[in-house]
Amino acid sequence: MCDDEVAALVVDNGSGMCKAGFAGDDAPRAVFPSIVGRPRHQGVMVGMGQKDSYVGDEAQSKRGILTLKYPIEHGIVTNWDDMEKIWHHTFYNELRVAPEEHPVLLTEAPLNPKANREKMTQIMFETFNTPAMYVAIQAVLSLYASGRTTGVVLDSGDGVTHTVPIYEGYALPHAILRLDLAGRDLTDYLMKILTERGYSFTTTAEREIVRDIKEKLCYVALDFEQEMATAASSSSLEKSYELPDGQVITVGNERFRCPEAMFQPSFLGMESAGIHETSYNSIMKCDIDIRKDLYANTVLSGGTTMYPGIADRMQKEITALAPSTMKIKIIAPPERKYSVWIGGSILASLSTFQQMWISKQEYDESGPSIVHRKCF
């Protein structure tokens, strides 16, 4: 029996993208949008083999005729039927494996409702008949991937942002802070401010175009006010973007106004603190003796930390909040888009982790609540 056959599967189900692959690999084999699309129109071509639903890239490519829905919102699964479709697609179409032959490691956002992970556990054992499974906290995996056991992780994806202080491998639950402001909100905000420029994006398909504009053109300004002044006085910051129909649009100060909302949530009408302040607040909730180690190991992870300029800006903002003599280091690994998955791959292939799996037998004896006892 070759190694690949019993390799654990690592599935990082993000609100925006699903990352899946085999434990021990250094990158996910499959990365596709966490989308389920359903046709908006009646099929008229007989024998076209039209399906009643499409998942992932196929939904993305046929988006013009589909209504796209994301079953995961703010890191929490809101539609379990669609979620099952995504998992089915992951195992059978993307990885091409039989889930009943592999242990499965899933990930989840901290401070998620308990029912969410119970249901995940139930579906894995009852629908997919996995021999074993485990649910790991996303931010903890990112820290593993960076080769550290102590640090504060700022993990920001498409649906949720959280800051998790970890000391010697233990997450400190009292100091975890969660911010329901992430990539999807920035996409919506960019849709809104592009409308002010006279470009209208409204449908679920057009939102995907705006997400692409955001990923290709946005950046974080080191000094927002100064950048606004520069944008007003010259056209040096303007960039053009070609829409799928060939129309070219020009994007100016929207490029940095959009991600600025991460530092100033008031842009979105939210009263919460920005990511810099949230990170600082998380550190301040920790014991005074370990803060120094946390300041020196602030690790960024997730797709919403991919904006150029974000690490420098975080450094500047946290330096302003922290004691003046404090050494502050922001770590932004180049592979941080996938660091949760990479951490999962590392964890699931450790020999010491093998006794941590929840087995089918344990599940049959205890039911879904076993997940709270065996997974942090």
From Swiss-Prot:
Top-rank lineage group of the source organism: Eukaryota
Modified positions (N-acetylaspartate) in chain numbering: 3
Organism: Caenorhabditis elegans
Entry's EC annotation: 3.6.4.-
Top-level class of the enzyme under EC nomenclature: hydrolase
Family (UniProt): Belongs to the actin family.
UniProt cross-references to InterPro entries, sorted A to Z: Actin, Actin/actin-like_CS, Actin_CS, ATPase_NBD
A molecular function (GO) term: hydrolase activity
Miscellaneous comment text of the record: In this organism there are four genes coding for actin. The sequences coded by genes 1 and 3 are identical. There are a few variations in the actins coded by genes 2 and 4.
Compartments, as annotated in UniProt: Cytoplasm, Cytoskeleton
The entry's keywords: Acetylation, ATP-binding, Cytoplasm, Cytoskeleton, Hydrolase, Nucleotide-binding
Catalytic activity annotation: ATP + H2O = ADP + phosphate + H(+)
Record's GO cellular component terms: actin cytoskeleton; cytoplasm
Claim: Ion transport is one of the keywords in the record: no
GO biological process: cortical actin cytoskeleton organization; embryo development ending in birth or egg hatching; mitotic cytokinesis
PANTHER family cross-referenced by the UniProt entry: ACTIN (PTHR11937)
Propeptide: 1-2
Protein name stated in the entry: Actin-1
Stated role: Actins are highly conserved proteins that are involved in various types of cell motility and are ubiquitously expressed in all eukaryotic cells.
